From Swiss-Prot:
Disulfide bonds: none annotated. Substrate binds at residues 22-24, 38, 61-64, 120, 153. It is an enzyme of class 2 (transferase). Belongs to the phosphoglycerate kinase family. ATP binds at residues 204, 326, 353-356. The keyword Transmembrane helix does not apply. This is Phosphoglycerate kinase. Monomer. Keywords: ATP-binding, Cytoplasm, Glycolysis, Kinase, Nucleotide-binding, Transferase. It catalyses: (2R)-3-phosphoglycerate + ATP = (2R)-3-phospho-glyceroyl phosphate + ADP. It comes from Geotalea daltonii (strain DSM 22248 / JCM 15807 / FRC-32) (Geobacter daltonii). PANTHER family: PHOSPHOGLYCERATE KINASE, PHOSPHOGLYCERATE KINASE 1, CHLOROPLASTIC-RELATED. It is found in: Cytoplasm. One of its GO terms (molecular function) is phosphoglycerate kinase activity.
């Protein structure tokens, strides 16, 4: 892998630097940002650029405005939050290009920062339109991708734009993402354990197929576990099951067994009579799930067994919660695993995916894991062994 990083560029002074960030952060109904991890994550790259005298243009998307200018998806709240984090004004453009934007760019001084409006206000962004990309580039001399979480998309501000700007580089957030992933998957200190949770097998099918050939321990929790348990012949009541993937689950289990991989499924679970925070619930063996009840969390025997396996690991990757952690009564399994992972002092522990990130933060142990990836889909695609379009163009430019 040969990628040029921003700190390897000899001179940024007075250069017009376009930084693609990912400020696609959650907001409440009043437009207040409720979780700013991705903005915080981009600060080191932005600070480096302005401290070295660059004129910085930032671009991001927010939500899914579907190629239309919708006020609720404005980048203004993100620009305000970034101003607070940087301790300096971040100028806010009302568009992505055009005469007004040109005037703001022309007025930039070394160390200034200009935030463009939401790039997805234009259909050309998601179409990877080269004309739109070059309008965004707007005479910039250096392009920096610091948006790992969107680098699995061949979109104009991530992919096509690299043909419009002469120098192409990656930022520090991107560097961290790729470094930790390579450490975990390319040259891991073994045993290597993967924890996969979440609702459906279908969303992580390719990941599972790939991991069976790479890891030493696989732990399955969340709704997806019950497709595997049914594949093993158990009755799982009203629990979430993808019946069309039963044969696939059997094949994955067989492959894991042939390779000598420790493949752990829940032994017990917390079941409820309905999907609700105030439902009646109880803990039962996975062999005794009532026919009209559904499993919404893993039980204490499962977390104890998972914990024992994880204590043997030197590298851990976790994607997906163990249960419906948004409801307090079904969060114990997820939080228990979070505590175990956080307690692995001598292991490299990597958290990937929005729900897992939220769970680790809610459990209060975010500062005790090695790395929390900002990418959901991008992280999964790397686990699947896929090349990310946004990373591929960086590799090509770095050669």
């Amino acid at each position: 892998m040969s990628i040029l990083y921003i700190d390897e560029i000899k001179d940024l002074r007075e250069k017009l630097v376009f930084i693609r960030v990912d400020f696609n952060v959650p907001q409440d109904d009043n437009g207040n940002i409720t979780e700013d991890t991705r903005i915080v994550g981009a600060v080191p790259t932005i600070k480096y650029a302005i401290e070295n005298g660059a004129k910085v243009i930032l671009a991001s998307h927010l939500g899914r405005p579907k190629g239309e200018k919708k006020p609720k998806y404005t980048m203004a709240p993100a620009a305000r939050r970034l101003s607070e984090l940087l301790g300096k004004e971040v100028k806010q453009a009302t568009d992505c290009f055009g005469p007004d934007v040109d005037a703001m760019v022309a007025a930039l001084q070394p160390g200034d920062v200009l935030m463009l409006e939401n790039v997805r206000f234009y259909p050309g962004e998601e179409k990877n339109d080269p004309d739109f990309a070059c309008k965004l580039a707007n005479g910039c001399e250096i392009y920096v991708n610091d948006a790992f979480a969107v680098s699995h998309r061949a979109h104009a501000s991530v992919h096509a734009i690299t043909k419009c700007i002469p120098v192409i580089a990656a930022g520090f957030l991107m560097k961290n993402e790729m470094t930790f992933f390579e450490k975990a998957m390319t040259r891991p200190v073994r045993p290597l354990a993967a924890i996969l949770g979440g609702a459906k097998v279908s969303g992580k099918l390719e990941v599972l197929e790939t991991l069976v050939g790479k890891v030493d321990i696989i732990i399955i929790g969340g709704g997806m576990a019950f497709t595997f348990l049914k594949a093993r012949g158990l009755s799982v009541g009203k629990s979430l099951v993808e019946d069309d993937l039963i044969d696939t689950a059997k094949r994955i289990l067989d492959n894991a067994a042939k390779r000598g991989i420790e493949f752990l499924l829940p032994e017990d679970c917390v079941v409820a009579d309905r999907f609700a925070a105030d439902a009646d619930c109880k803990t039962v063996s996975v062999n005794d799930i009532p026919s009209e009840w559904m499993a919404l969390d893993v039980g204490p025997a499962s977390t104890a067994r998972f914990s024992d396996a994880l204590k043997e690991a030197n590298t851990v990757i976790w994607n997906g919660p163990m249960g419906v952690f948004e409801m307090d009564r079904f969060a114990k399994g997820t939080f228990a695993i979070a505590d175990v992972v956080a307690g692995l002092k001598n292991a490299t522990t990597i958290i990937g995916g929005g729900d897992t990130d939220s769970a680790v933060r809610k459990a209060g142990v975010a500062d005790k894991v090695s790395y929390i990836s900002t990418g959901g889909g991008a992280f999964l695609e790397l686990l699947e062994g896929k090349k990310l379009p946004g990373v591929e163009v960086l590799e090509q430019s770095g050669k």
